[in-house]
């Protein structure tokens, strides 16, 4: 990302014009599915239409604020969609819930632990929205995966995330749980906005591919004078 190029330039004192940003792509199986395989979905959560979050214990993933935001969402939502959390253990989630004083939301959470990559496209398609409000990302391939599936995305307005997402995602200040909750409620309460974000995400994802990555990398190699 250009964000990382700037960081490298400053940290290593390399002229910016000597660094080229070449964007990642995503696997082509991330695409809108004509029909969601409920057998896969129900391995993790009973019904589709849930909120989806790929978490881990790295502080930059912002798990504490995501759960706080979800608590705020539940207080104001008529639908109260469940939250599916990938790649986090129950002990960690319990600790965060106790720390934030929101243990009462646990009944709305599903946390199956590891979810294989082969199931992610189905889960993106089955979800109502994807949460990716990290504090920092060098790129953010899950953004592309979700957008490519036609899933509305809520992401952070910091580091490389707005650069990657463009208009294909709703951005928030990731340090403010109330903003994350507001965006979820906007998607839920405004059908026009929801459909627009699905379309914008699909359009944005089409600008990225591994073939394009390879082509741009090849151009850089060919431009090097030995």
Language model: regions and residue ranges:
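Carbohydrate transferase catalytic cores enriched for Leloir-type hexosyltransferases
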Residues: 1-226
